[in-house]
């Protein structure tokens, strides 16, 4: 738990610092919450919950309730100390009003109130207030209920007492402004993912999520997220569809140089490295100094153990291999969570930790804990070292395979794959490539495309299930190599990790997966997304991967009105409009597109490829740990969860993603 330097009794208006006013938020909302689409909408929930999490991290809150109300408003209630309501010395108004109406006002900026804070990365609950048509704040404190309501960030009346209570804490309810957001419909899955993550990261806290919007059967929904063992449970959850090398979780929780550090590690029989890192509950997708410290400790400690064990060092000598840092991380799943009082974030998405002091602290903590584990568990230590030797052998084979491939790589003067119909424009920022399922659809796509900016790569045969193969075998798959060569990704560029994908010479700004609008198509989408997620994650992180959205139907009314329908709902809307909701088979004609090959070149261009009219879904990774767990499930041996997931998500391959 974070240290508290103020006691509960003196957390008051004097601890609330004010940094700037609210006017700018409504003018430029995207600057404050990232965007005004679904992502920004859900960010409002995260910002509100962050206040409650700060109270939990400070040791004052054990329960948080998040409710999606029937009218799409959100209620967040906790049992913390309650936002202070006394008068603010400088502004001569209630501290609650200051917190709710001034951007970046809050106890988290006053070092005495919270030593660390997750919400600091965001913009505070006042931003939520500014972007809501209505908001109601209630504080349960000193036996009273204090209340204030707002419209678009402006208070409707001063803070007042509206009743008495035995409760303690804060309740916030807000109604997002439909004139600001492109959608105000909340997705259960997106909120649930973040609440689950927060429960894992804050051991012992109980987060209850309710959805009061009745489903088709008239039922509401509730789920409780609670992880008594925190990160130990988190790493097991992420790894639950993989086969473990051994059942232990290597775990540490300590403090070094004033930095609280918690790490959980498991080894599995797969071949990818999956490390998820967090700073103050924020997912640092781009890594940073804490990840650098972890990797350095892992390499140094395991190498020292192998060197000092005569049997293992003899094994390495016999195999004639030199072990590299990456070999120690193959088949490793880890969650690293640290708390930093003043985090410095860098990188493209501001999700990379820059604090230099953190690397040494994490390296020291992990080094000590891992050394102790290896000494106390020689059997498991031997299993890890055997896997490391196998990884090193495979890496050397991969380098040879890669070098033979890169001799023919477009970036080194060789030819492009013969199947690629390239575009004539040479400016990558203006170019896009379609990865098209099957030759017949590839033919239509080649005819229908804009040859100046659009390239087509038909994919024939099975896409390799990359989750299940040794790293070097990926380079032996023709379909995978065609993709890698075509888009211009290079591996093991001088000075980089052998497995690091370098996208500096990416040949296209958009890489678009175009498959049939059915379950098989969704499965192929998933295989290709897994390839990028596991081997070329930067392509996704930097926003280059998309999924095309071909129509499901062409609906015609009396040969006069034609409409492409991309969902079952759109088809029903067409029937409602022209035929009283029923397909009578006379005035209405419905053509179901079972595959891309059923469309001619003109139709394919019009519906799926024309930048002016097409629907593209960008593949993003909002929550890397959840994506990791989903991808390992989709590529795992258990057929039933995979079939269920793909059938449920066939109309939208949103794995966040």
Q: Over which residues does each language-model region extend?
A:
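Helical (often loop-to-helix) elements that flank the catalytic cores of nucleotide-handling enzymes
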Residues: 89, 346-359, 564-570, 574, ...
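Conserved short strand/loop->alpha-helix "switch" segment adjacent to the catalytic nucleotide/phosphoryl-transfer site
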Residues: 27-45
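C-terminal interaction appendages of subunits in large macromolecular complexes
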Residues: 393-412, 427-432, 443, 447-449, ...
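A short glycine-centered beta->alpha linker in the GHKL/HATPase_c
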Residues: 82-87
């Amino acid at each position: 738990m974070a240290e508290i330097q103020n006691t509960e009794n003196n957390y008051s208006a004097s601890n609330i610092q004010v940094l700037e006013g609210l006017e700018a938020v409504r003018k430029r909302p995207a600057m404050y919450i990232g965007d005004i689409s679904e992502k920004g909408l859900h960010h409002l929930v995260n910002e509100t919950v962050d206040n409650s999490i700060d109270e939990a991290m400070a040791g004052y809150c054990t329960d948080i309730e998040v409710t999606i109300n029937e009218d799409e408003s959100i209620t967040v209630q906790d049992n913390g100390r309650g936002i202070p309501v006394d008068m603010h010395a400088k502004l001569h108004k209630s501290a609650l009003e200051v917190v709710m109406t001034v951007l970046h006002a809050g106890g988290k900026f006053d070092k005495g109130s919270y030593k660390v804070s997750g919400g600091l990365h965001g913009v505070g609950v006042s931003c939520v207030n500014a972007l809501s048509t209505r908001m109601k704040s209630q504080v349960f404190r000193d036996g009273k209920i204090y209340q204030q309501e707002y419209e678009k960030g402006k208070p409707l009346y001063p803070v007042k007492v509206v009743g008495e209570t035995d409760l303690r804490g804060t309740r916030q309810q807000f109604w997002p402004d439909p004139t600001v957001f492109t959608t105000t419909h909340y997705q259960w899955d997106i909120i649930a993912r973040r609440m689950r993550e927060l429960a894992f990261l804050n051991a012992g806290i109980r987060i209850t999520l309710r959805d009061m919007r009745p489903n088709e059967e008239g039922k509401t929904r509730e789920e409780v997220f609670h992880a008594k063992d925190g990160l130990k449970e988190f790493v097991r959850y992420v790894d639950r569809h993989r086969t473990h090398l051994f059942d232990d979780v290597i775990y540490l929780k300590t403090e070094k140089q004033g930095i609280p550090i918690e790490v959980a590690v498991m080894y599995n029989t797969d071949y990818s490295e999956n490390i998820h890192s967090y700073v103050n509950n924020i997912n640092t997708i781009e890594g940073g100094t804490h990840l650098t410290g972890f990797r350095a400790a892992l390499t140094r400690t395991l190498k020292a153990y192998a060197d000092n064990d005569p049997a293992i060092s003899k094994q390495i000598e016999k195999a004639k291999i030199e072990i590299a840092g990456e070999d120690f991380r193959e088949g490793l799943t880890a969650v690293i969570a640290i708390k930093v009082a003043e985090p410095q974030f860098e990188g493209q998405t501001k999700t990379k930790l820059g604090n230099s002091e953190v690397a040494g602290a994490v390296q020291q903590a992990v080094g000590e804990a891992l050394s102790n584990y290896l000494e106390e568990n020689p059997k498991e230590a031997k299993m890890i070292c055997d896997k490391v030797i196998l990884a090193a052998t495979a890496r050397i084979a991969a380098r040879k395979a890669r070098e033979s491939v890169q001799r023919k790589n477009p970036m080194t003067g060789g030819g492009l794959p013969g199947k690629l119909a390239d575009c004539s424009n040479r400016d990558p920022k203006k170019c896009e490539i379609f990865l098209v399922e099957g030759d017949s659809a590839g033919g239509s796509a080649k005819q229908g495309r804009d040859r100046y900016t659009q390239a087509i790569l038909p994919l024939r045969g099975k896409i390799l299930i990359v989750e299940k193969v040794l790293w070097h075998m990926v380079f032996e798959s023709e379909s995978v190599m065609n993709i890698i060569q075509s888009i211009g990704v290079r591996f093991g560029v001088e000075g980089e990790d052998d497995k690091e994908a370098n996208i500096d010479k990416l040949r296209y700004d958009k890489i678009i997966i175009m498959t049939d609008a059915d379950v098989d198509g969704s499965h192929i989408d998933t295989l290709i997304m897994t390839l990028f997620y596991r081997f070329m994650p930067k392509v996704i992180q930097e926003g280059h991967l998309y999924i095309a959205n071909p129509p499901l139907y062409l609906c015609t009314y009396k040969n006069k009105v034609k409409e492409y329908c991309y969902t079952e709902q759109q088809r029903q809307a067409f029937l409602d409009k022209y035929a009283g909701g029923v397909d009578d088979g006379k005035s209405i004609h419905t053509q179901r597109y079972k595959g891309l090959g059923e469309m001619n070149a003109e139709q394919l261009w019009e519906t799926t490829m024309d930048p002016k009219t097409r629907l593209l879904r960008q593949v993003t990774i909002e929550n890397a740990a959840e994506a990791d767990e989903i991808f390992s499930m989709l590529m795992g041996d258990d057929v039933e969860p995979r079939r269920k997931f793909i059938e449920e998500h066939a109309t939208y391959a949103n794995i966040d993603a």
